Every structure is written in structure tokens, then in C-alpha cells.
Design a protein with these regions (language model features):
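Extended, loop-rich substrate-binding clefts of extracytoplasmic carbohydrate-active enzymes
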Residues: 27, 34-37, 45, 129-206, ...
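Hydrophobic beta-strand positions in extracellular immunoglobulin-like domains
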Residues: 214-215, 386
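A contiguous, surface-exposed recognition patch within enzymatic or periplasmic domains that forms
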Residues: 53-66, 70-128, 218-378, 393-404
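Bacterial N-terminal signal peptides that target proteins for export
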Residues: 2-11
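Short, hydrophobic/aromatic-enriched beta-strand segments in well-ordered soluble domains
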Residues: 70, 164, 182-184, 378-391
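C-terminal motif of bacterial Sec signal peptides marking the signal peptidase cleavage site
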Residues: 20-22
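Short peripheral tails and domain-boundary helices/loops at the edges of structured domains
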Residues: 401-415
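Short, Gly/Pro- and small/polar-rich lid/capping loops
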Residues: 28-60
Length: 415
């Protein structure tokens, strides 16, 4: 990591070289933004340029691009596989930006890949103050992962590295000090296909990137089950669609040895017309109309999940680390639960709350690192990668079969 420090003196110059000059003024931004339809990457690019001096990582032909923001916690806000006029593949929450209001609980700006810390709830929670009831009124996202800017250590054409020193306080009353290093790398086509272990298909458009996220214990004490600890929590926010479905392959096995296949009652049990288990895959309807969340433990989770939307001809694949022998933290809002038994991955579909309000709508695919039982100075890394394929159904079908073990026809006939 020592080489990272050489970039500190000039990160903003490098970042500025990469992208449009946000300093050019709102008039130019508005003019350029309205040259593109809402929902396109070009629209979001110019919209977000009015909020931050963005970092844009680009592929060789300019079709594959991703937007990264240091001001907004090192998020990958959105991406495109087909250039400026192509579909914006991440969820951008315009209404939160446009409100200008800072919410005390969470500021849901969006972002198709964001760094968070867990656990959200439970004995080790870093979202609730000690002793309070774990209900929404008392839930507060730690500011370093919600509203504080991060530092740029390095920015190049296809890679950027960001850093944030932070303190989080847990439900036990322990103050944890850590440093986060987040490296985001745009993958060229050949590298992306090699990473997935499948043959390249020239008929498909593709944007892919890898994120390597590391936390370091900066305290003078070890993080243990007595002090409480944290985990890395990666969340991808994508746009829902009427026929979109999340697909999660799982490891088969007896419940006695591997635990139940899926935890599906986070917000009440998910109805059968929205959640289905067929063969060795779990299917979740992601239309943005019904709030639902599921999770898989480390013995059930494979290192892959997907989401398919036939209307936008998009198949998204996420890959991530899973350690079958590690401890994962419980994130439920219940301090009575065992804090050392939790999920390794989750999926979410947004929907209206009881009062009719809604944050999105959006869908999420999430992955979690093992518990960070770290001695002073030790680090823990978690890798989470995103691949968006755009193309005809027949070509996407090959990818789905090879990576998810199911066909597009099976996905479309589940619900």
C-alpha cells in the first residue's frame, strides 16, 4: 500500500483529467444533460456532474464506462455498456438529490455499487446506540458511509483507489477505529470473460468492473467477540422492471449440515408468487412493487448471483468472495440473536412502506465479508465484481446457462 501514497499530492488533478469539467457551470451541465433522454448514461453523467467532480473509467472504445464519486462515499453510481446514449444501469435517486435535505437515518442517493459496514442490527450493530430499542426511529447510518466525502489516492483511465479513515460505535459501546481502502477497476472485455471463465461473445455488449475493499484495524486492541466487530457489506442498487428477476444459485445439502436454504422473512414471509426455489436456484421477483429481502448463509451461498431484465435485454452477474469456514455476522434488528450466525449474501426488492412512501424503487444484490476479528494493524479484504451483459436473448441465454446454471426460458417461466 505504500505506493498509494505517492498519488495523494495530485489526485484531484488526475480525477479532473478524466472527466467533464463540472466547474464549467450549471448552464452547460443542463444543456448537455437534456441532450440525452432520462434513463441514459449521458443524462446521469451530466446530472451527477453538477453534484461532484466525477471520476469516469472508460474502456478502449468508450462503450463501457462507469461513474465513481469520491464525494459520495466512493460509490460506483452507474455504468453503461453502450456509451453515452446507452441505458444507465445503476439506480440514481434524483428525488433525494433534488430535495437538498440531509436525512438523519440514511441518505439514499443510489449507486450500483456502494461500500457499507455491517452489522446493521443485533448485538454488534453500528447503526444503533447502546441500549436503545432496535427500531427505525433509532436507526442511523454511520456518517462516513452515508454523507462524508472520501479521499482519492489514485485515479487512472481504468482504475481508481479511494480511502477513508473512520470511527464507528457499536451497540456494546465500543468505539472502533478503522481505515478503508477501496480499489475500483474497469475490466476490459477479455479480462472480464477470463475472470468468469467463459468464452467471449462478440454479439454482446459488456461493462464490467472489480472492487477490492479492505478494512484495517487502527485501534490498539484486538476486535473480538467481547468488543464486538464489523464486516464489509457491499450493496448493488439496480433499476427494477416489471419482469426482472434475481437468480441466486445455492449449494445443495441437508439442512442439518448446511442450514436452511434461504432466510426469507426479514420483512415478513415473501409470497410464493414472488419467491421460488427450483432445482438449485432461488428466484426473486424484482419489480420494485413489494418490499422483500432474503439471505443465504456461507454454506449455502455460491460466489455468484444474477439479475435478468428482458425488457432492457440486460443480464447482470455479480461475483464475490464466500468463505465456507468463516464466521458471518447476524444483521437482524434483534440483539437477542446470536451475533455470530448470519448471511454471506442477500437480495432485496424495494416496494412501498405501509404509509405508501418508497425510497426507490430499486433492487439490490448484496455480499458480505466474514467477521473482521482483527488484531491492531491487520486488514480484511472483500472482493465484489459486477458484469452487465446487453444483447439478444439467445446470446444472454448462453451466459445464464454457463454461469447461473439456468436458461432464460426457465427464468421467464418462474412467475
Amino acid at each position: 500500500m505504500k505506493n498509494l501514497r505517492t498519488a495523494i499530492a495530485f489526485p484531484f488533478l488526475l480525477a479532473a483529467c478524466l472527466l467533464l469539467p463540472a466547474c464549467g457551470g450549471n448552464t452547460k451541465k443542463d444543456k448537455n444533460m437534456h441532450a440525452f433522454e432520462k434513463g441514459t448514461f449521458g443524462y446521469d453523467l451530466y446530472y451527477l456532474s453538477g453534484k461532484d467532480s466525477l471520476i469516469v473509467l472508460k474502456g478502449e472504445n468508450g462503450n463501457a464506462q462507469i461513474i465513481v464519486s469520491a464525494k459520495y462515499q466512493g460509490k460506483v453510481f452507474t455504468s453503461t455498456a453502450t456509451g453515452l446514449s446507452g441505458k444507465s444501469l445503476g439506480f440514481v435517486n434524483y428525488k433525494v438529490f433534488d430535495s437538498g435535505v440531509i436525512d438523519e437515518h440514511m441518505n439514499g442517493y443510489g449507486g450500483e455499487n456502494r461500500f457499507w459496514l455491517g452489522p446493521e442490527g443485533g448485538k454488534y450493530s453500528v447503526y444503533f446506540e447502546p441500549g436503545v430499542e432496535q427500531v427505525f426511529d433509532n436507526w442511523h447510518t454511520p456518517k462516513p458511509i452515508d454523507i462524508e466525502a472520501w479521499n482519492i489516492l489514485f485515479s487512472g483511465e481504468k482504475e481508481t483507489i479511494l480511502e477513508k479513515a473512520m470511527q464507528v460505535n457499536n451497540y456494546l459501546g465500543t468505539a472502533l477505529h478503522l481505515n478503508v481502502i477501496r480499489k475500483i477497476t474497469l475490466l476490459e472485455r477479455d479480462a472480464a470473460y477470463r475472470m468468469l471463465g467463459i468464452a467471449a461473445n462478440p454479439n454482446l455488449n459488456l461493462v464490467a468492473y472489480s472492487t477490492n475493499n479492505t478494512i484495517f484495524n487502527k485501534d490498539d486492541f484486538e476486535w473480538t467477540s467481547q468488543t464486538g466487530t464489523i464486516c464489509i457489506w457491499m450493496l448493488d442498487m439496480f433499476n427494477p422492471a416489471p419482469r426482472a428477476v434475481t437468480i441466486i444459485p445455492f449449494v445443495e445439502g441437508k439442512e442439518k449440515e448446511s442450514g436452511k436454504i434461504v432466510t426469507s422473512d426479514y420483512f415478513g414471509e415473501i409470497p410464493a408468487d414472488r419467491l421460488s426455489i427450483q432445482g438449485n436456484a432461488i428466484y426473486l421477483k424484482t419489480d420494485g412493487n413489494y418490499r422483500s429481502k432474503l439471505g443465504l448463509n456461507e454454506k449455502r451461498a455460491k460466489e455468484i448471483a444474477g439479475n435478468y431484465d428482458p425488457d432492457s435485454q440486460r443480464l447482470t452477474i455479480t461475483t464475490f468472495n464466500v468463505d465456507k469456514n468463516a464466521v458471518y455476522l447476524n444483521q437482524e434488528w434483534n440483539p437477542a440473536k446470536d451475533p455470530l450466525k448470519g448471511d454471506a449474501m442477500n437480495a432485496y426488492n424495494d416496494g412501498p412502506l405501509a404509509d405508501g412512501s418508497i425510497m426507490g424503487p430499486f433492487l439490490e444484490v448484496e455480499s458480505v465479508s466474514p467477521a473482521a476479528f482483527l488484531k491492531p494493524g491487520q486488514g480484511l479484504s472483500h472482493i465484489h465484481n459486477v458484469f452487465h451483459f446487453i444483447g439478444e436473448e439467445a446470446d444472454l441465454n448462453l451466459v445464464a446457462q454457463q454461469l447461473l446454471g439456468v436458461s432464460i426460458e426457465e427464468i421467464m417461466n418462474i412467475f
